[in-house]
């Protein structure tokens, strides 16, 4: 699923279990440790969708944007943050339509290379979908390599909120730049 920096799997109480009591947490942990194939004959795939960000969390991220951030960039970032936890990660997944309607996110589909079965988006598909949904313009490339050739390289200090960052190497990835943390680490929104 989508994530914001390192905080995506942590809810307001700091544990990732907001609203759960110890008995329920223990029960869920027990069930997750079971071998479902051996015990029940079921092949269970753990999906990577996280809890959506709260309105307060989204507001907090938005309030940290530089004052000169354009309305379009603000809308792109807000939409990206609002999608956290709502779109499953699915390798090779691309959007069929702008916004949520027509994409059937979360419906069962053929397994991807890691066995994920819920329809969703991969990192480059997610970035393209966010931009398409907000601006009405479908980026000319949907894959990581295509997005790399689409843009131009900028220096780290010249990154602006909403910029697409393509990470190359043996495990390529696409993220949306949000800002820098107080210790200079990149904070991003990603699939």
Name each region found by the language model.
Residues 30-124, 132-137:
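N-terminal capping segments
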Residues 128, 132-191:
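...with weaker cross-activation on analogous glycine-rich loops/strands in unrelated enzymes
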């Amino acid at each position: 699923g989508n994530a914001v920096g390192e905080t995506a799997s942590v809810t307001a109480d700091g544990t990732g279990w907001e609203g759960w009591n110890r008995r329920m947490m223990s029960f869920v942990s027990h069930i997750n440790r079971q071998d479902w194939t051996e015990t029940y004959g079921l092949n269970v795939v753990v999906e990577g969708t996280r809890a959506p960000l709260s309105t307060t969390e989204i507001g907090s991220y938005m309030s940290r944007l530089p004052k000169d951030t354009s309305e379009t960039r603000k809308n792109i970032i807000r939409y990206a943050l609002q999608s956290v936890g709502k779109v499953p990660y699915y390798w090779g997944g691309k959007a069929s339509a702008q916004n949520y309607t027509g994409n059937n996110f979360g419906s069962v589909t053929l397994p991807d290379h890691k066995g994920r079965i819920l329809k969703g988006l991969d990192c480059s598909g997610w970035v393209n979908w966010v931009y398409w949904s907000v601006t009405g313009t479908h980026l000319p490339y949907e894959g990581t390599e295509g997005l790399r050739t689409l843009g131009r390289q900028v220096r780290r200090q010249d990154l602006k909120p909403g910029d697409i960052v393509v990470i190359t190497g043996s495990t390529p990835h696409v993220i949306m730049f949000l800002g820098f943390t107080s210790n200079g680490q990149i904070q991003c929104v990603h699939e």
